Amino acid sequence: MWDWLGRVGVNTGLALARVQAQARTLVLARVQVQVQTQTLARVRWRGAVCCLLGLGVSLLAGVGFIGAACAGGAVVSDLDVIRGGDATDGFARALVPRTFEFPHDHGPHPEFRHEWWYVTGNLDAADGRRFGFELTIFRVGLVPGVGAGGQPAGVGGAGSRVGKTAGDVVGGVAVAGGAVAPGVAAASAWRTRQVYAAHFAITDVGRGEFKFAQKYSRDALGLAGAQGEPFRVWVDDWVLGSPSPLPLASAVPARSPSQAASAMQGDPTRGAGTAGLAPGLPWTLHAEGQGYELTLDAEPLGQPVLNGDHGLSRKSAEPGAASYYYSIPRIAVHGKVVRAGVSSDVRGLAWLDREWGSGSLGAKQQGWDWFALQLQGGSAFMFYALRNHDGTRDPNSAGTWVDPSGRAQSLTSDQVTIDVSDHWTSPRGGRYPSRWRVRVPAVGLDVEVRPVLANQELGTQPRYWEGAVDLKGAREGHDAAGRGYVELVGYGE
């Protein structure tokens, strides 16, 4: 949970990663790397909320080890950076609004400490079965610095550039001033300055099953990585990205809540007129685990929407306690779900969230409740309620309303009322909200939101709840219904 990834070191998104790095000098001719995730929590900053990432990393690297850099004979530990210390040291921070360009911004931003690609959705099978799914991939920078072309300087996945600079990590050892630490092979293929983690979950509503799996790896030897054009991000064989190389598209601006957007051509609920709306798409998605395999083709039904202040999503009043955050709230998907060798054709609606930054959750903040609701008729609602330790809502909580034409409207904390009417107690411990009434008078929304299954908790460390929901109620005096996803962080500790 990346970055988590959500958003990493999150004062507003990342409740920061706890990284256990064991440095061991191996008298081996080959480098053995073992990345173990004990606490992988979504370092996600969901829209403005960042997630807790507990990344338990054990990097055993030949003659070198993670956590130390040699500079003029001095050994400097990098563990403070990994654990969060001052998570922004050396990394870029989200301070002011920026210009978004697509497809470039679908790809990685290695100058920031963390980011994530987050997809959720609801699917219907031809035989009447229903599924919910989540695939999230997190990138976490271990040390700051980028190489040529704005990419990580080390030799990594397909998205990396060759070329080494000061601060490169060689065999797990940070190199200062371009000089390799004694005894470390400069050309080590295991060198990396970032790690990736992924969460996959599927809700089989008819069977009453919820299954989740996770993977983690380093950006080396093609084990994990990300690239911008054509877009692709992967951890092992879990992947999100272009099905094949696409011609580079010209920069296309996204829609921000303060900009009036022209209406989409065709029916936005059916995907007509999507050409050029989200350059770089369509994409494919693949993941499998715990007896389920999911393969989908995805095509947007609208342009990317910038959340917050033209894409700058603030989590607290502290400078840099923010992320850059955009969403594609309606994506048509179709493909297959395979369980026990039996394949079901499915189609449905998904949601993409993208965030990157270098901040973390504030000292007063405990977690967040994130809502992504897709209403019949084409509108969408996103809101993240940041929770303080005393149970109050942080005033930096915020959201976005998107009407059927694609026009977006920012929502402040005082414009959204969320009342909890039921709870669910996890067998692992922890009590989660389990039914909500969501009211947004500014857009005439008043709906009840219910999980399709009570238990949609991912037993990662830390644990969190992320699940498919139904909604029913009224919008501007008319009946309203739809589906969506809710994320609950900070309840299962």
Per-region residue spans from a language model:
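Intrinsically disordered, low-complexity repeat/linker tracts enriched for polar/charged residues
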Residues: 10, 14-46, 253, 265
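The N-terminal extracellular segments of secreted preproproteins, especially immediately downstream
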Residues: 1, 44, 49-50, 69
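Bacterial N-terminal signal peptides
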Residues: 48-67
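Short linear/disordered segments characteristic of secreted peptide precursors
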Residues: 26, 38-42, 56, 162, ...
